[in-house]
C-alpha cells in the first residue's frame, strides 16, 4: 500500500457509499482570521456542520491539506509533522452513529480495502458524565461488528467529546479507532491511552448530537451530523509496517535526497536523523505553503512568518549536518514527485517554489552569518547565563533573527533567553509600527465622486492586467483610491521590469479603447467563485455578493461603485512601482483625460 493508493482507496470507498467528493480547501482559511492555517479536516466544513446547506449534498468525502504550527519545536521525533493530510467523510444529517461506524469498520477490515485484521483494532467511546449519558449506542455497534468488550475503552470528555466551538453550539461524543502495532506492552497497564507507540490512533468519528445553550444545558439536536478524520501519514505508517511516518513513501524520497546532499546515512546516528527529519518535514511544508492558492511569501507577519521560520529552521539544521551550500531548491523535485498525481499545483509552481526558497535561503545565509557573530560577541560579555529580552529583540530587529533561532543558539551555547522581556519589546515595536502604518495607508475609496469611481474601475483593469503579465499568483493585498490617483498593493516578490510595466499599461489602455461595458451582477458567493471571480483573500462575504464584470475581461467581487463603460476612463498611466513590504509590490497610477 502506498500513500497515493491509500488516498484513492478512501475516496473510492466513500464514493461507492454515495458520498460526493469535494475538493480540499486552501491551507489558509478563507473566512477565519483566528487561525493562520487549516489545522484539521473539519475546519473548512464548520459552517455546514453548524447548519448551513452544502451545495454538494449531505454526504461528502474529501482530502484536506493541514498545517499545524504549535508543535514545530517537537518536529524531529518519529511522529510529529507540520504538514499532513486528513481524509474525511461527512454526514450532514443523512446518517449517524451506526452507519458511520459500520462504514469505518468495512473500510478498515475489508479485503478490498485495507484488510486490517479486526483483532488489531481497539476503540474508545465516551464514558458519560453528569450532563451527558454514556455512549453505549456506539459501543454496541462496535460489539455487533466483532470488537470484543475488552477492546472497547470508555474514556472521559477530554478524550472522547468534541466541541462546542466557543461556549455554546453543536457538540457531541466521538469514537476513536486505534490499531495495535504489534510492539510489546510497555507495562502491565499499557493501553490505548499510553504514548509508548504500541497503539496508533488512525481515525476519529465525531457525532454532533447536542446543542449546548447559553445556560450550559445540552439539548438533543434535530439534525445530527457526523464528522470523521483519518490521518493519512499515520495510517500509511501502520500499513507499511513502519514505526515512524518518516520511514514511509511520504518522506523517504526527500530523505534519500538529503542523504545524497549531506553524505549522511539516515538510521546511523540519532542526532543526524533528527536533523534529517526536521529538514524533510519543513521543506515539504514550505513547498505546500508556496504552492497554495492563498499566495504566501516569507515575511515577518502571519503565514509568511511561519513560512520563513520553516525555511530558516531547515537551513539551521542543514548546517548541523555539514551542508554549507544552498540546497533547498534541490529538494523540491523530491517533494513534487511524491505528490504530483494528486496536487498538480506543486508541478505547476515548481519553478516558482524553487526560486522563492533560493531567495529566502540567500537572505538567511547572510543573516545567519552576521547574527551568529553578533550572538557570540554579545554572550561573551554577559554577566549571567540569561540573554536579556532587549538583546534578543535587537537580534530580531537588527539582524532579522527569529526569536526561535536565538533560543536554539542559546541552548547550544549553554544560555537561556528572557522570553517575557523579548515579547514586551516586540509588542512595543508592533504598536509603533501600527501607528505609523495608520498614518501612511488607509484602505479603500476616499469618496464616491466620478473621478474616484473612474479610478476604481481602472483598478479592476489593472488587477487583471497584472495577472496576465506577471502570473496567476498576483492577488490584491490593499488599495487606496482618491480623485487624483490610485494606489494598488499586490502579491509579487520582484521589482517589475520596464517592459512588464509597459505591457500592463498597454493591456489596460486596450480595454479602455475597446469600450467594454461594466455590469453589476448579484449572485451567490459559491457561484462567483465557480465562475473564477477574483475576491479579496480572507475577506468575509455574505452569501449573496455583487460581482462587477468588465465585458469578458475581468470578473471581481466588489461593492462598487464603477463607471458604465471603460471608454469613460481616459488614458491609464503607471507613475510608480515599488516595494510595499516583503513579497508585496505597490503601484501608483493616474488617468489622463484626452
Swiss-Prot record:
GO terms for biological process: alanyl-tRNA aminoacylation. Its main location: cytoplasm. Its cofactor is Zn(2+). It is an enzyme of class 6 (ligase). It is found in: Cytoplasm. The keyword tRNA-binding applies. This is Alanine--tRNA ligase. It comes from Borreliella burgdorferi (strain ATCC 35210 / DSM 4680 / CIP 102532 / B31).
